[in-house]
Design a protein with these regions (language model features):
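Short acidic/polar active-site loop segments enriched in Thr and Asp
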Residues: 9, 47, 120-123, 153, ...
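N-terminal small/glycine-rich loop or linker at the start of catalytic domains
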Residues: 4-26, 77-97, 121, 126
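N-terminal binding-site loop/beta-alpha segment at the start of enzyme catalytic domains
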Residues: 1-75, 148, 229
Length: 257
């Protein structure tokens, strides 16, 4: 009998740091370490894993596939981030100009995710962020087709503005497409902007909110303290100041000083 979770909340493990050494965000780079982390997570009664095509240039998904997540009884969520028009690192297979949310790129990346994860479909698949170079109507038509093809059981969106959420939901209602049922966004004691407008929008459309970065990249734990020197912060960690912003927190370094 699996252990009973101690928290009534749905705790999801984010696998952003799983992946091949040298790829973006990857800090847990051996399969043995990844397996040990999953063992501890499951020992506490949790089963849902969150990854993304972008994490580790696709190697986070590959590691989870190699770790036979299905045989472990895990539930898998993944995402596809559009890099077109953004100054971001690309994976080896990215086209010139980056990925967008047009049909060709959506289908290619869903296929790549499923191949890496070694499965025919995942539980929850997200549009990881807005692509404002492609009409939502086109994107959502393809998302609905992928849903009908069994690529995922639930559709989610992440990092969209409240007005974009409303627009997406209205298009889906009008066209009879699968509705987004989950929104993943940053939320913690330092970053509460979602309370102002987004929460009301999600409540209106019946969309659940999944909070990522609840501990502000570790700032709200005992791991960091006032007076730490730059060399004491692990390079590439969620609390490493990069370009004036604390990686993974959405908060400028000045705010935390």
């Amino acid at each position: 009998m699996p252990p009973t979770p101690k928290s009534p909340l749905n705790i999801i493990f984010g696998a952003m740091t799983f992946g091949r050494a040298g790829t973006a965000q990857a800090r847990v780079t051996s399969l043995e370490e990844c397996a040990a982390i999953l063992d501890i997570f499951q020992a506490h009664g949790h089963t849902e894993i969150d990854t993304a095509r972008y994490y580790g240039a696709g190697t986070s998904e590959e590691y989870l596939g190699e770790l036979n997540w299905q045989d472990r009884g895990l539930v898998m969520d993944t995402k596809f981030y559009p890099t077109a028009g953004k100054n971001m690192p690309e994976d080896d297979g990215a086209p010139e100009g980056g990925w967008n949310h047009g049909e060709e790129h959506l289908r290619e990346n869903v296929g790549r995710s499923l191949e890496a994860l070694r499965c025919e479909g995942v539980d929850l698949w997200y549009l990881h962020g807005p692509d404002r170079t492609t009409a939502f109507e086109e994107t959502l038509r393809v998302v609905n087709a992928l849903y009908k093809e069994g690529c995922f059981s639930r559709f989610g969106i992440s990092n969209y503005m409240a007005w974009e959420v409303a627009q997406i939901c209205e298009i889906c209602r009008r066209e009879g497409y699968v509705m987004p049922t989950v929104y993943q966004g940053v939320y913690n004691a330092l970053h509460q902007t979602v309370e102002q407008e987004l929460f009301s929008c999600l409540r209106y459309y019946g969309v659940a909110f999944y909070a990522y970065n609840p501990l502000a990249g570790g700032y709200l734990t005992g791991r960091y303290w006032r007076g730490m020197q730059d060399g004491e912060v692990e390079r590439g960690s969620r609390f490493d100041v990069q370009g004036g912003e604390v990686a993974g927190t959405g908060v400028s370094g000045e705010v935390l000083e």
